[in-house]
């Protein structure tokens, strides 16, 4: 049974001690229908198609709200050299702050920790990775201010940057003899409790009991504090804003670029605002936005050339939303190639997902799966026209990506790994299509054994490695092909978040039952109880994800580990308020703030 922590955890998280399958094997609703005349092949062994009327589903997604001409018209003055020079001057000033005399750092490590935290939340810490690493190396073993706030902030930042700082030794003075957290009477009580709350989300699976206690303890306090603040209307509006934001979703789970945009506004009105940091954050945000605009325009031109958005009127035409995902995964300007190629992969995944979920018949889907597994452009004559379009767009794009790796790195072995990932993806889609067509409802475990693949994260992450690694190595490709924890656990959370945000809409249009419905069918609980259970699983699996950051082989670059973490954060961002991928209105304001409107 799930622990009854719903009242003490944020909206996006509750917790229970449950297990999800971590093996890598792949193994009745009435939808709206439309009638379409289409040639259909009867089986993979039949080459001659047969004309007949096919009853097809329709999801009625609607056209994109972002026209090609509008995207191509995007422009920014922040591409200019004058802003680049301004940015460099500001970076020099901030770098000097981080490189203060060692005696100052030793005397006041809290000041440096707060500076690092602000740089991270403002979205500019990527400029100062070396300086931050040197500072944390010095601070790591230094005694810190004994307050809960100072201890918790240090713990969170060290864990955030990969230091395995011990939890019990850090917080022992704030625990009773049973190891439970206890209240103190310090003046920074709320500030300290908020810091402890945020720090708890970086705990790992072996620390789950401390996690449960810390979240229960801090959440109850913070909710009571907010309620009292709203009644008394005291002066600490800045702290109250931070607390409410954290209770909605903890910092560790948030999409970094949107968090930066939000925090820039909040920081500007804060009591300790540093004008140099603020100016740096604004200028950098606008310069990076200009880079993202050019990336988006590139992907939009590619998408138009494929013709998939126009020809596949049953599928989601969501080039902007697909690009949004990639910015959540890796926003730094130097990774434009990864963003562009990953957005192309996302567009292909979205179209093919809709082929399996919405439009294709089971016979057609078996043909398409077989074609992808064969990876032979000469054997597609038996496919209907819309599937030929999908296959050749996929085939040409992936082969082009392989060619670029060959040209730039003299590495010619990545295509077999990429095509196998796509074949596994289509096989997992086919499993769900068979479940839907037979009316079968799997157990939650059986569903998850397939669904962590069908959610597309393994394909996305394998491509992301190929787009960022230099050099690309056979050892890494073999390692990733076996679905290590960093991929499998990331995919688990993406799937569960996806199901929380989209399952109701998908069932209405006709789709396989998701994790919520599988658990309801298996246990007989209500939908609310099932959703609470899924939130519990997300919290548990996040702790496994925190563990999976460590212990990876050296041939996996740090940037790839970051993408795997950020993919999870992006899923929580995209599905926090429903289906942000399929329902464009749920994402519109965020797209405007990230890609269209500069910060004044």
UniProtKB/Swiss-Prot annotation:
Its cofactor is Mn(2+); Mg(2+). Belongs to the terpene synthase family. Its main location: plastid. The Asp-Asp-Xaa-Xaa-Asp/Glu (DDXXD/E) motif is important for the catalytic activity, presumably through binding to Mg(2+). A motif (DDXXD motif) lies at residues 353-357. It is found in: Plastid, Chloroplast. Mg(2+) 1 binds at residues 353, 357. It is an enzyme of class 4 (lyase). GO terms for biological process: diterpenoid biosynthetic process; geranyl diphosphate metabolic process. It comes from Citrus limon (Lemon). Pathway: Secondary metabolite biosynthesis; terpenoid biosynthesis. Optimum pH is 7.0. It comes from the Eukaryota. Monoterpene synthase which catalyzes the conversion of geranyl diphosphate to gamma-terpinene and the minor products limonene, alpha-pinene, beta-pinene, alpha-terpinolene, alpha-thujene, alpha-terpinene, myrcene and sabinene. Mg(2+) 3 binds at residues 498, 506. GO terms for cellular component: chloroplast. Inhibited by 100 mM KCl. Keywords: Chloroplast, Lyase, Magnesium, Manganese, Metal-binding, Plastid, Transit peptide. This is Gamma-terpinene synthase, chloroplastic.
């Amino acid at each position: 049974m799930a622990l009854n922590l719903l009242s003490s955890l944020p909206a996006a998280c509750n917790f229970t001690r449950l297990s999800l399958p971590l093996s890598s094997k792949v193994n009745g609703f009435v939808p709206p229908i439309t009638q379409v005349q289409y040639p259909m092949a009867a089986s993979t062994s039949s080459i001659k198609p047969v004309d007949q009327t096919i009853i097809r589903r329709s999801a009625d997604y609607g056209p994109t709200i972002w026209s090609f001409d509008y995207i191509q018209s995007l422009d920014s003055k922040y591409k200019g050299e004058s802003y680049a020079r301004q940015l460099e001057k500001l970076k020099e000033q901030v770098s000097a702050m981080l490189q203060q005399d060692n005696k100052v750092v030793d005397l006041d490590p809290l000041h440096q920790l707060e500076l690092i935290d602000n740089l991270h939340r403002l979205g500019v810490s990527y400029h100062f990775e070396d300086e931050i690493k040197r500072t944390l190396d010095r601070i790591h073993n230094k005694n810190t201010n004994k307050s809960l706030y100072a201890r918790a902030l240090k713990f969170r930042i060290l864990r955030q940057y990969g230091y395995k700082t011990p939890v019990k030794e850090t917080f022992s003075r704030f625990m009773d003899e049973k190891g439970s957290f206890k209240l103190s009477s310090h003046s920074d009580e709320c500030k300290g409790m908020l810091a402890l709350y945020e720090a708890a989300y970086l705990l790992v699976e072996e620390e789950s009991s401390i996690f449960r206690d810390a979240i229960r303890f801090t959440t109850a306090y913070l909710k009571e504090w907010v309620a009292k603040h709203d009644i008394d209307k005291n002066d600490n509006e800045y702290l109250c804003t931070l607390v409410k934001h954290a209770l909605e979703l903890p910092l560790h789970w948030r999409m970094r670029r949107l968090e930066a945009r939000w925090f820039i506004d909040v920081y500007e009105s804060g009591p300790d605002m540093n004008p140099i940091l603020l100016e740096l954050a604004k200028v950098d945000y606008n310069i990076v936005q200009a880079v993202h605009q050019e990336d988006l325009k590139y992907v939009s031109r590619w998408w138009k050339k494929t013709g998939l958005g126009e020809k596949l009127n049953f599928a989601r035409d969501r080039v902007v939303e697909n690009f949004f995902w990639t910015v959540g995964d890796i926003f730094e300007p130097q990774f434009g190639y990864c963003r562009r190629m990953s957005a192309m992969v996302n567009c292909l995944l979205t179209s093919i997902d809709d082929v399996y979920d919405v439009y294709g018949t089971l016979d057609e889907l078996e043909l398409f799966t077989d074609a992808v597994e064969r990876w032979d452009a000469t054997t597609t004559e038996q496919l209907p026209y819309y599937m030929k379009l999908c296959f050749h767009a996929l085939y040409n794009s992936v082969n082009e990506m392989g060619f670029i790796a060959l040209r730039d790195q003299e590495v010619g072995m990545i295509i077999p790994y990429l095509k196998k990932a796509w074949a596994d993806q289509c096989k997992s889609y086919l499993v769900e299509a068979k479940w839907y067509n037979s009316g079968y409802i799997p157990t939650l475990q059986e569903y998850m054994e397939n669904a962590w693949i069908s959610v597309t994260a393994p394909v996305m992450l394998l491509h992301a490695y190929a787009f960022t690694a230099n050099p690309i190595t056979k050892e890494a490709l073999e390692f990733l092909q076996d679905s290590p924890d960093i991929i499998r656990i990331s995919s688990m959370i993406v799937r569960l978040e996806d199901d929380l945000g989209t399952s109701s809409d998908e069932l209405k249009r006709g789709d396989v039952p998701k994790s919520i419905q599988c658990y309801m069918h298996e246990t007989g609980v209500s939908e609310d109880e099932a959703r609470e259970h899924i939130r519990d699983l997300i919290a548990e699996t996040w702790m496994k994800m925190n563990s999976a950051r460590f212990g990876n082989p050296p041939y996996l670059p740090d940037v790839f580990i970051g993408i795997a973490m950020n993919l999870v954060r992006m899923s929580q961002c995209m599905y926090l308020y429903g289906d942000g991928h399929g329902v464009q209105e749920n994402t519109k304001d965020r797209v405007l703030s990230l890609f269209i409107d500069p910060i004044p």
